[in-house]
Design a protein with these regions (language model features):
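Non-catalytic DNA-recognition/assembly elements of restriction-modification systems
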Residues: 1-30, 159, 163-208
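Short, conserved charged micro-motifs
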Residues: 119-124, 167-171
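Sequence-specific dsDNA recognition surfaces
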Residues: 19-37, 49-81
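Short, surface-exposed loop/turn microsegments at beta-strand edges and helix-strand junctions
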Residues: 35-45, 58-64, 74-77, 95-108, ...
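Terminal anchoring/processing modules of extracellular glycoproteins
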Residues: 114-117, 127-132, 136
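Short, ligand-facing micro-motifs at secondary-structure edges
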Residues: 51-64, 82-85, 89-107, 124-128, ...
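A short glycine-rich beta-alpha junction/loop motif
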Residues: 104-111, 144-171
Length: 208
């Protein structure tokens, strides 16, 4: 719910409009890393397969050397950044970058929503909007934004229609729900830590 508006409302409140995702933020596909650049260590690169359950699985990421990651400097991500799969059977799925200390970049065909230097300040509204049924359906392979080949372009995504509330309502929503999104990210980071501890314990047990 945004202010007094609900999904059952037949009319938009004063100051609200039907806009597009592109009216809220820019979207671009990630960097096309060369196959020979992949390494076992280095900076993590987020691929489509790493977008899981509205989060990012950082432990399964491939890596590139720092000098190659630097070529994609426009696609370094921060905690709170939102990413979207742009091709394949999982087209349209989204994930929020969890809390982490690593330098991470985005691979080609993973879209990044550009929310500024402090993405968490704008992420709650976008995250909620992208999960809203009418919007998410347009981003799925059988929706109207993509093609028969299950592909989305940045323009496809930016053109998807959304309800755009008054600026003050958006700011209030983001402020109110920022801590909720932080909690989700912290929980995902904790799950990641516990998973690593589990792997260590299992390795020690099996080595006895």
């Amino acid at each position: 719910m945004l202010g007094d508006y609900t999904t059952e409302s037949s009319e938009l409140p004063d100051g609200w409009s039907i806009g597009s995702i592109g009216s809220y933020c820019d979207v671009k596909s990630g960097y096309a890393f060369k196959s020979e650049w992949w390494t076992d260590v280095g900076h993590k690169v987020i691929k489509i397969a790493n977008i899981i359950n509205n989060s990012i699985d950082l432990d399964s990421c491939d890596n590139v050397a720092p000098e190659n990651a630097e070529k994609a400097s426009n696609f370094y991500v921060k905690p709170g950044d939102i990413l979207i799969a742009m091709t394949g059977a999982t087209t349209g799925k989204i994930g929020v970058v969890p809390y982490c200390d690593e330098l991470i970049v985005v691979n080609q065909r993973v879209g990044r929503f550009f929310l500024g230097d402090k993405p968490l300040e704008k992420a709650p509204f976008l995250f909620s909007t992208l999960l809203y049924g009418r919007v998410s359906r347009h981003l799925q392979p059988d929706g109207t934004a993509g093609s028969a080949q299950d592909n989305l372009s940045a323009d496809n995504i930016k053109d998807v229609a959304i309800v755009v509330p008054d600026t003050k309502v958006i700011e209030s929503f983001n402020s109110t729900h920022q801590n909720h999104l932080k909690s989700i990210m912290l929980n995902n980071a904790e799950i990641r830590t516990l998973s690593k501890l589990q792997d260590i314990m299992l390795a020690q047990i099996s080595g006895r």
